[in-house]
């Protein structure tokens, strides 16, 4: 009887853990979609760029959620800034930087 109870407890603990991870991933998808849509709308880019930026921002949110180190978060922010700069023309990157609220949100 004790073994059955222990198995049930482990099963429910595993189920709750899995549910929490799925919920966190859904939140990351929502944040990445919002950032990519806002950047694409501001810079008047196409669907391919939106997909590319979604993947970039999802990577950013996923990596930031895995760490609590401020130093690591700064490294991630620098990576995102460099990838944005490499992906965009100089004019479009400057336009994004001028919109400081959006720029700070997408790199931090």
Residue ranges and their predicted role:
Residues 21-108:
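Charge-rich (acidic/polar
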Residues 1-25:
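Bacterial Sec-dependent N-terminal signal peptides
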């Amino acid at each position: 009887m004790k073994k059955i109870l222990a198995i049930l407890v482990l099963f429910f603990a595993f189920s709750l853990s899995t549910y929490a991870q799925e919920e966190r991933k859904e939140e990351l998808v929502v944040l990445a979609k919002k950032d990519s849509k806002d950047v694409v709308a501001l810079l008047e880019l196409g669907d391919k760029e939106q997909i590319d930026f979604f993947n970039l921002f999802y990577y950013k949110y996923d990596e930031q959620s895995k760490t609590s180190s401020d130093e690591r978060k700064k490294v991630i922010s620098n990576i995102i800034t460099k990838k944005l700069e490499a992906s965009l023309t100089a004019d479009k990157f400057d336009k994004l930087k001028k919109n400081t609220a959006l720029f700070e949100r997408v790199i931090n």
